[in-house]
Amino acid sequence: MLFRSVVQFGKTTGTIVTLPAATGTGNIYRFVIGVTATSNANIIKVANATDVMDGSLCLQQDTDADGTLKLWRADAGDDTMTFAGAATTGGIVGGFIQCADYKAGFWSCQAWTQSGGGSEATPFSATVS
């Protein structure tokens, strides 16, 4: 995975990306959802149990309706973002995610995505051990 480039999520079966260990390099990784994952999910996670994600996500609640947005921020200890296709955590074509290695142990992650409807939920979680 190259920093300063855009990585496309392009598989209907989803993709799992593991970010490098956060050391404060200033490297920025950008992801675009080019294909909606219809099984599994597109997942971005940190490299180890000590790195965490800061940041926030803006999600358009329903791709068929304008003007309805949901916002979430990462909780302390969150280390994973999951974009489950047409489900409630986003993952529809056109979504954009950016993760910056801004200091040792910390990633700043922002995302702008859409969901297919339903009861939307945060894509942030703590799964790396």
Where does each model-flagged region fall?
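Exposed extracellular interaction/assembly regions and N-terminal maturation sites
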Residues: M1-K70, A100-S129
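Structured beta-strand segments within beta-sheet-rich domains
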Residues: T68-G95
